[in-house]
C-alpha cells in the first residue's frame, strides 16, 4: 500500500523496549494511521479511538478485551478494535507488518 502526498512523522513510536515500532502517517484527507512492525512476542494495547488493524505481511493471533476468543490474522486480513477498549496481540515467528487506521 502507498500513501501519496501524505505527511510521515520521522520520529518513531517505540513500545515494549523496541519490539513494536511504528510511524504516524497523516493522509491528505486528514486520516491518521500508523505503519509499523511487531516482533515476536505477546503485547497488550489499549485504544482511545476505534481502530482497524490491517496485516500487510506476517501473521498474528488477537484477543479483544472482554472476550476469550483468539482470532488468527495474516497478510491481507484486518480486524477492528472498539474505542476505549484494547487487544492482546501475539506474533510467533516472523515479524508482523501492519497499518493501523484510527476510525471516527
Region locations from a protein language model:
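A generic beta-sheet turn/junction motif
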Residues: 29, 66, 91-93
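Short acidic-glycine-tyrosine-enriched beta hairpin
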Residues: 67-84
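Conserved short histidine dyad/triad with adjacent acidic residue
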Residues: 26-48, 80-83
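A short, N-terminal "cap"/entry segment at the start of jelly-roll beta-barrel domains
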Residues: 1-31
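Short, conserved beta-strand element in jelly-roll/cupin
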Residues: 47-62
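Ligand-binding loop in jelly-roll beta-barrel domains
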Residues: 82-104
